[in-house]
Design a protein with these regions (language model features):
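Divalent metal-dependent hydrolysis catalytic cores, especially in the metallo-beta-lactamase
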Residues: 89-90, 100-125, 139-150, 182-196, ...
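Active-site gating loops and adjacent loop-to-helix segments of metal-dependent hydrolytic enzymes
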Residues: 68-96, 146, 151-157, 192-208
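Mid-domain alpha/beta scaffold segments of enzyme catalytic cores
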Residues: 118-161, 168-173
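N-terminal metal-binding scaffold of metallo-dependent hydrolase/deaminase domains
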Residues: 1-42, 55-56
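Histidine/acidic residue-rich metal-binding segments in metalloenzymes
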Residues: 127, 169-188, 192-228
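Short, acidic/polar
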Residues: 96-104, 165-177
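Divalent metal-coordination and catalytic microenvironments
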Residues: 8, 25, 30, 52, ...
Length: 228
């Protein structure tokens, strides 16, 4: 189906963009073909009248944890204990997966059409990515990392990242991630904000440099990019 989006205010996403009117966006096979004057003959297109609403390119969120809604926490919680409870039974895993799918759909409804996940529950992210691609779930395009790699006591260790005690542990998780067909590898190299218990921990180096190097070298050799 070919679509023509008319009667809208276009924001084209460029650095110096200005609202544009009296134009029409032509879409063929799910891709933008052209932006033309609204006087163009549109008989080959299904017209979508925007009634003066804004239209802009889909946004991209490069740092997403689908295990949470993104809303501020009212108080600090034991994420490792919470995740262990969630993943301990098929019932709680099913409920959690529905929540994850809902959070992804919220991103899409907010105008975010592509997300990159950087630490999640088990292999939920790749599963959801594949279901969205298959059309059985509604959501944005997902570049998925599944669980990240951290170290004992490190950022998100035991929740949305595994705690690797050694280089061999880290490489074993890397191998598992590749089997899950992730799009990228996520490392938790420094202390984070949400689970910090002391001032100064966020940004503090936690993962040994030799572990970082070993993971990156193996991931790159296998064709994966690494986020940290």
């Amino acid at each position: 189906m070919n679509y023509a989006f008319t009667n809208g205010i276009i924001l084209d996403g460029t650095r110096d963009m200005k609202p544009q009117t009296n134009l029409c966006i032509l879409v063929q096979d799910g891709k933008i073909k052209d932006i033309v004057p609204d006087t163009t003959d549109l008989h080959d297109y299904k017209i979508v009248d925007l009634h003066g609403h804004y239209i802009l390119p889909g946004l991209i969120n490069m740092h997403v944890h689908l295990a949470g809604s993104g809303k501020p926490q009212k108080k600090q919680r034991d994420n490792e204990k919470l995740v262990n409870t969630i993943m301990s039974s098929s019932l709680t895993r099913t409920i959690a997966y529905k929540m994850v799918a809902g959070f992804a759909k919220d991103e899409l409804l907010g105008g975010v059409t592509t997300i990159r996940t950087v630490g999640g529950l088990g292999s939920f992210d790749t599963r959801l990515r594949d279901e969205i691609q298959a059309g059985t779930k509604t959501g944005p395009r997902i570049l998925a990392s599944n669980q990240g790699i951290s170290v004992p006591g490190g950022h998100m260790a035991g929740s949305v990242a595994v705690a690797a005690s050694s280089i061999s542990d880290a490489l074993a998780h890397l191998e598992q991630s590749e089997k899950e067909k992730v799009n990228l590898i996520k490392l938790m190299i420094t202390g984070g904000v949400l689970d910090a218990k002391e001032k100064g921990v966020p940004g503090e180096l936690k993962m040994p440099p030799e572990m970082v190097r070993a993971i990156c070298e193996k991931a790159h050799a296998d064709g994966y990019l690494v986020a940290a």
